[in-house]
C-alpha cells in the first residue's frame, strides 16, 4: 500500500446509530418503528465439489464480463421463462406422498437425509419439520446408527436434543463400548453427528475422538463405496459442507448406491438444472449491473470477480427463494473487493483518510475532496446501498439505512486501522488482528444486510442486536472466515507486503517456528470456533433461524473457497463456478 506518514487527518467518528432506539419492551413487529427512520434519495452518476474426472465441461471458459454476458445471452442457456415441467411436478408430488406415508422412523430419517444431500429438502420444509418434531423422543432399542442420525438431523435443523442419548452406548467408566468399532456404519453416523457438538458437550468430543480413530484404522479394509464416503468425511464432515456443492457431488454419487430411487435421482437432476437456470438469470442481472457500474474500467487495479462474488452468495443462501437476496448481496461483496484493493494496493494514506471521513459523512458533498477514482467508488457504494434500502422499504416498509450505513463505516474504519498499523510499523496481537479482520472481511456487513434482505422474524428487539458489539453468532462465523482467508491467501499477501497474518501472529506469540505446525494450530482454533458456533444453534436465540443458517453457511463457504488441494475433496473456485452455474446434468 502506498502511504505517507500523516495521520493527523483521521478524525474520530461518532456512532451513526446513536439515538435511533425506542423504549425497551417485549419483542414486537418492527414495521411501524422502522418506517419512522429516514432514507436518503438515490443519486445516479453514470460470483463442494469438483466435477468427476469422467464428466466433461461442455461450456467455454468464462474469463471476463463480456464472455459471461455473451454466454448468458444464448437462448438455450438463458430461456425467456424457466420451464417447470410436468414430469418434475409429478416427481415432487410422488416424493411428498412417500415422505408423508413412511411410517418406520429410520427409513423416514434416511429419506430426509437423502433429500437434504440432493438439494431437494427446500420443497418439503413443512413435512420435514413435522416429521422431525415427532423424532424428538427416540426409541429405547434404537441402535447407534439410528440414534446418531436422529441427533444430527434434529440439531442441524434447529431442534433441541440432548447428547446424553449416547450414554447408552458407553460403559461404566464413561467410555464408548469397544464393540462399537465393529459397527462401521454406526460409527460413521456417530462421527458425522459429533461435529454438531458445542463446547461443554464432552460426550460428543469423546465420540469424535473414538470414531475418528477407528474409522481411520478400518479405512483400508472397507468396501470401495463406503471407503470413499468415509475418506471424504474424514477430510470434510457433512456439517461443514456447502449445500449446493454437496448436492452436485451427491447427485453424481447417488445413482451408484444400492437401493437408490431412480425417481429421486431423476428429480434431483431436473431440480438441479432448474436451480442452475435460476442462477444464470441472477448472474445475468449481476453482470449487467457490474458492467454498467464501470468500476473496473476506471479503477484498473481493482478485482473483477462477479462470478466469485456470486459463488459466495450461493454458499450463504442456497435456497432458490432467496434469489433477490443473492443478487443484492453479490453487489455488496463486489464493491467490498474494490474498496479492499483501494486500501491494500492503491491509495496513499492521505487519500485513505479522506475516503474514510467521506464514508462517515455519507452524503454527496463529502466526495468533493476525493480523487476521481475514489469518487467513482464512493458513488457506487452510496447508490448501491441506498438502492438496497429502497427495495427493503418497498417490500417491508422498513427504513434500514442507519444499520447498513453503520456496517460500511465500521468496515472502512477497520481498513483504516490496518493501514495505520502498516504505516507506523505497529504489530497487533492476534486477538486485535482477528477481531478487526472479521470486520474487514465483510462478515458483519454481509450478515446485517442479509438480516433485512431476508426479512423473516424481524422485531424491534432483535434489530437492537445489529450494532457493535455484533452478535456472537456473527463473530464466530466471521472469525472462521477470517482464519480460512489467511490460510488460503497469507503467502500471496505477504509477498506484496501486507500485514502479518493470523498464522504469523500466532506463531510469534507462541514461539512456533514451523509453518506447518502454525497452520495446524489455526485449524484447531477453527475447530473450537465451530463448537462455539454450534452452541449458538443449541441456545434459544433471539435471532431468526434464517439468519442463523446464513451465518453457518458463511463459515461453510469460507473453507470451500479458500482451501484448494489436488486429489482431495476440494477443488478450485473456477471448477466450482463451472459445476454450479454452467454444467447441467444430462
Swiss-Prot record:
Protein name, per record: Monoterpene synthase TPS4, chloroplastic
GO terms under biological process: diterpenoid biosynthetic process
Residue window of motif DDXXD motif: 340-344
Known catalytic reactions: (2E)-geranyl diphosphate + H2O = (2E)-geraniol + diphosphate
Annotated positions binding Mg(2+) 2: 340, 344
Cofactor binding comment, as recorded: Binds 3 Mg(2+) ions per subunit.
Cofactor annotation: Mg(2+)
EC top class named in words: hydrolase
Pathway listed: Secondary metabolite biosynthesis; terpenoid biosynthesis
Note on domains (UniProt): The Asp-Asp-Xaa-Xaa-Asp/Glu (DDXXD/E) motif is important for the catalytic activity, presumably through binding to Mg(2+).
Membership in a protein family: Belongs to the terpene synthase family. Tpsg subfamily.
Complex formation: Monomer.
Function: Monoterpene synthase involved in the biosynthesis of volatile organic compounds. Mediates the conversion of (2E)-geranyl diphosphate (GPP) into the acyclic monoterpene, geraniol. Does not use (2E,6E)-farnesyl diphosphate (FPP) as substrate.
Single GO MF descriptor: magnesium ion binding
Keywords: Chloroplast, Hydrolase, Magnesium, Metal-binding, Plastid, Transit peptide
Organism, as annotated: Cananga odorata (Ylang-ylang tree)
Subcellular location: Plastid, Chloroplast
Amino acid at each position: 500500500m502506498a502511504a505517507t506518514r500523516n495521520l493527523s487527518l483521521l478524525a474520530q467518528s461518532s456512532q451513526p446509530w446513536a439515538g435511533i432506539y425506542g423504549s425497551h419492551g417485549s419483542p414486537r413487529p418492527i414495521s411501524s418503528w422502522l418506517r419512522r427512520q429516514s432514507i436518503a434519495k438515490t443519486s445516479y452518476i453514470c460470483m463442494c465439489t469438483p466435477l468427476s474426472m469422467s464428466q466433461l465441461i461442455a461450456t467455454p471458459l468464462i474469463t471476463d464480463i463480456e464472455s459471461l454476458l455473451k454466454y448468458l445471452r444464448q437462448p438455450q442457456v438463458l430461456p425467456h421463462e424457466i420451464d417447470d415441467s410436468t414430469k418434475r411436478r409429478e416427481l415432487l408430488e410422488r416424493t411428498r406422498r412417500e415422505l408423508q406415508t413412511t411410517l418406520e422412523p429410520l427409513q423416514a430419517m434416511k429419506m430426509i437425509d437423502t433429500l437434504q444431500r440432493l438439494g431437494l429438502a427446500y420443497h418439503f420444509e413443512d413435512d420435514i419439520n413435522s416429521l422431525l418434531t415427532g423424532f424428538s423422543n427416540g426409541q429405547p432399542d434404537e441402535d447407534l446408527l439410528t440414534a446418531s442420525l436422529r441427533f444430527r438431523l434434529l440439531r442441524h435443523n434447529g431442534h433441541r436434543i440432548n447428547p446424553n442419548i449416547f450414554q447408552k452406548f458407553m460403559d461404566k467408566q464413561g467410555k464408548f463400548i469397544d464393540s462399537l468399532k465393529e459397527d462401521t456404519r454406526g460409527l460413521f453416523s456417530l462421527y458425522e453427528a459429533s461435529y454438531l457438538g458445542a463446547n461443554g458437550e464432552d460426550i460428543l468430543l469423546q465420540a469424535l475422538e473414538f470414531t475418528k480413530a477407528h474409522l481411520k484404522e478400518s479405512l483400508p479394509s472397507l468396501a470401495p463405496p463406503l471407503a470413499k464416503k468415509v475418506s471424504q468425511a474424514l477430510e470434510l464432515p457433512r456439517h461443514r459442507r456447502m449445500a449446493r456443492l454437496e448436492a452436485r457431488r451427491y447427485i453424481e454419487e447417488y445413482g451408484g448406491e444400492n437401493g437408490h430411487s431412480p425417481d429421486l435421482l431423476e428429480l434431483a437432476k431436473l431440480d438441479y438444472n432448474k436451480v442452475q437456470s435460476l442462477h444464470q438469470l441472477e448472474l445475468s442481472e449481476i453482470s449487467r449491473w457490474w458492467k454498467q457500474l464501470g468500476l473496473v474500467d476506471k479503477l484498473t487495479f481493482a478485482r473483477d470477480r462477479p462470478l466469485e462474488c456470486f459463488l459466495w452468495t450461493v454458499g450463504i443462501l442456497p435456497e432458490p427463494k432467496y434469489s433477490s437476496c443473492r443478487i443484492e448481496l453479490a453487489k455488496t461483496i463486489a464493491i467490498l473487493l474494490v474498496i479492499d484493493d483501494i486500501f491494500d494496493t492503491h491509495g496513499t494514506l492521505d487519500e485513505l483518510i479522506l475516503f474514510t471521513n467521506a464514508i462517515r459523512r455519507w452524503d454527496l458533498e463529502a466526495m468533493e475532496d476525493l480523487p476521481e477514482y475514489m469518487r467513482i467508488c464512493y458513488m457506487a457504494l452510496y447508490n448501491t446501498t441506498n438502492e438496497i434500502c429502497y427495495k427493503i422499504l418497498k417490500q417491508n416498509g422498513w427504513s434500514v439505512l442507519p444499520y447498513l450505513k453503520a456496517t460500511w463505516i465500521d468496515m472502512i474504519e477497520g481498513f483504516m486501522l490496518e493501514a495505520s498499523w502498516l504505516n507506523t510499523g505497529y504489530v497487533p496481537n492476534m486477538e486485535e488482528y482477528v477481531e478487526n479482520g472479521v470486520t474487514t472481511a465483510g462478515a458483519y456487513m454481509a450478515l446485517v444486510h442479509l438480516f433485512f434482505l431476508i426479512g423473516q422474524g424481524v422485531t424491534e428487539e432483535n434489530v437492537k442486536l445489529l450494532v457493535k458489539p455484533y452478535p456472537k453468532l456473527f463473530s464466530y462465523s466471521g472469525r472462521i472466515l477470517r482464519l480460512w482467508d489467511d490460510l488460503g491467501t497469507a503467502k500471496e499477501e505477504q509477498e506484496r507486503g501486507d500485514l502479518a497474518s493470523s498464522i504469523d501472529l500466532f506463531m510469534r506469540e507462541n514461539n512456533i517456528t514451523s509453518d506447518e505446525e502454525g497452520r495446524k494450530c489455526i485449524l484447531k482454533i477453527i475447530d473450537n470456533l465451530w463448537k462455539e458456533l454450534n452452541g449458538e444453534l443449541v441456545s434459544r436465540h433471539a435471532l431468526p433461524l434464517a439468519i442463523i443458517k446464513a451465518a453457518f453457511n458463511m463459515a461453510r463457504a469460507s473453507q470451500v473457497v479458500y482451501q484448494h488441494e489436488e486429489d482431495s475433496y476440494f477443488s478450485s473456485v473456477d471448477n466450482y463456478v463451472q459445476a454450479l452455474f454452467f454444467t447441467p446434468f444430462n
